[in-house]
Amino acid sequence: MHCPFCSATDTKVIDSRLVADGHQVRRRRECVQCHERFTTFEGAELVMPRVVKQDGSRQPFDEEKLRGGMLRAVEKRPVSMDQIEQALTKIKSTLRATGEREVKSEMIGNLMMDHLVNLDKVAYIRFASVYRAFEDVSEFGDAIAKLQK
């Protein structure tokens, strides 16, 4: 690794530690030439699968779109940002674990509902009503009845 101070190519690692729940390595380095010290972080480059929409079009996975949908569903509900971020992390891990290069948007929506039903039932109904395009009150009633079982 090049020294950020003198651009020398020879540096040595003084200390290595796992950070971010073991997903990154923090390394303390020292330049052999100028003896300045600096820190680097290493992490795996994780590629998310592409999303196949219902109309057949394909687009890159958009974490912000996923986060926005969840935030709208839990708006004014007693759900913390930590809970939201944990759910998003689990959804992304599940998608990566499929090993597929492409996943259907339907799978993402179902994963979102699986997590919302455990976080907050009202948020689940909100999301499901939009995602499943409820057209009348009876569809809301059916969804609520399933939750009460």
UniProtKB/Swiss-Prot annotation:
NCBIfam families: transcriptional regulator NrdR (TIGR00244). Belongs to the NrdR family. Negatively regulates transcription of bacterial ribonucleotide reductase nrd genes and operons by binding to NrdR-boxes. It comes from the Bacteria. Pfam families: ATP-cone, Zn_ribbon_NrdR. Keywords: ATP-binding, DNA-binding, Metal-binding, Nucleotide-binding, Repressor, Transcription, Transcription regulation, Zinc, Zinc-finger. InterPro entries: ATP-cone_dom, NrdR-like_N, RNR_NrdR-like. Binds 1 zinc ion. Residues 49-139 form the ATP-cone domain. This is Transcriptional repressor NrdR. The keyword Manganese does not apply. One of its GO terms (biological process) is negative regulation of DNA-templated transcription. HAMAP family: NrdR. A zinc finger (unnamed) spans 3-34.
